[in-house]
């Protein structure tokens, strides 16, 4: 009796599949051992508020953030300007909650496949992160690799991790938000004064003309005075000008003492109904617009700092030069139209 060729092929395929399955599962590189939900950083988890320094490194980029004496997070690489405490606290919380899910590869040749290759490489996709306490003790330290959302073992979110001094890679629960550019870590907010809270704006050039815009008491319009006389200001121009300090932010910042050869554009003084007065000057530097403030001590009241508590930047506006986005600079530049006249 001749053997059935189809049966032989089926048995060979079944044997090959079984052998391959056994080989993969017995290989140290492809262990599917679970980690029993063990915390990755138990010291951080037990006391996350002890974190005092955050170090990040990837592809040659190094960032360091520390807490100052006022417990404000600052960027050591950006003149100790205030960092986004919301972002840093989120990273601390995400790291503290991380748990080991499964053992992964130990083979260096496979590290780049899951993003846990040496972070010092120029083209590295991995990110090194370290959290330290006030005394320098390490609360968390790891290379963070690729992330995913939902997989075939029931994990909603996961991150591949590896300790920089160990070969073993792991799959851990959760995802981590680690921006690689410094600006994303800074608290880029400057001021937030609602336009309806502004009573009067004075703008002038040196040398040059002066103009004043006041909110009228009758119909909510705006009255201006310039070299042409007195008149009602176009509502769109007034709207843009009076929103110049609303949600004001920056794209770069440095200490006032560090300055360049900038061209002065205009001066301004804003008076709010609360009594707050904010003066400043606008400069042009190549393609950037630079903003500097001149605020008297205690000159800013709570109305100007709404939602901005907990950082040193807003009580020390005079110390910094801010490069602001062009669309925000355009709001201030509406003042030039009023100074130049020809609005009637």
What are these regions (language model features)?
Residues 1-344:
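Secondary-structure "cap/kink" motif recognition
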């Amino acid at each position: 009796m001749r053997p059935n060729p189809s049966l032989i092929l089926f048995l060979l395929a079944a044997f090959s599949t079984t052998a391959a399955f056994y080989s993969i599962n017995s290989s140290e590189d492809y262990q599917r051992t679970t980690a029993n939900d063990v915390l990755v950083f138990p010291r951080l988890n037990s006391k996350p508020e002890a974190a005092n320094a955050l170090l990040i490194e990837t592809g040659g980029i190094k960032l360091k953030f520390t807490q100052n004496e006022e417990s404000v997070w600052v960027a050591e690489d950006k003149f100790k300007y205030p960092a986004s405490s919301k972002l840093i606290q989120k990273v601390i919380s995400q790291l503290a909650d991380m748990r080991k899910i499964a053992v992964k590869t130990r083979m260096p040749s496979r590290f780049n496949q899951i993003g846990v290759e040496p972070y010092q490489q120029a083209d590295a996709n991995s990110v090194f992160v370290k959290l330290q306490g006030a005394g320098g003790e390490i609360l968390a330290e790891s290379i963070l690799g690729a992330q995913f959302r939902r997989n075939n073992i029931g994990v909603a979110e996961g991150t591949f991790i590896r300790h920089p001094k160990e070969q073993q890679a792991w799959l851990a629960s959760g995802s981590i938000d680690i921006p690689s550019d410094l600006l994303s870590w800074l608290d880029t907010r400057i001021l937030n004064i609602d336009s309806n809270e502004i009573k009067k704006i004075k703008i002038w050039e040196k040398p040059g003309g002066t103009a004043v815009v006041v909110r009228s008491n009758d119909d909510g319009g705006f009255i201006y005075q310039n070299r042409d006389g007195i008149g009602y200001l176009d509502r769109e121009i007034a709207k843009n000008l009076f929103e110049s300090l609303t949600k004001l932010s920056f794209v770069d910042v440095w200490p006032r003492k560090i300055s360049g050869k900038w061209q002065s554009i205009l001066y301004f003084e804003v008076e709010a109904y609360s009594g707050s007065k904010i003066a400043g000057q606008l400069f042009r530097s190549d393609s950037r617009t630079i903003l500097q403030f001149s605020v008297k001590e205690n000159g800013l009241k709570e109305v100007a700092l709404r939602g901005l508590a907990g950082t040193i930047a807003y009580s020390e506006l005079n110390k910094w030069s801010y490069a602001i986005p062009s669309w925000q600079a355009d709001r201030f530049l509406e003042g030039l139209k009023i100074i130049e006249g020809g609005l009637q």
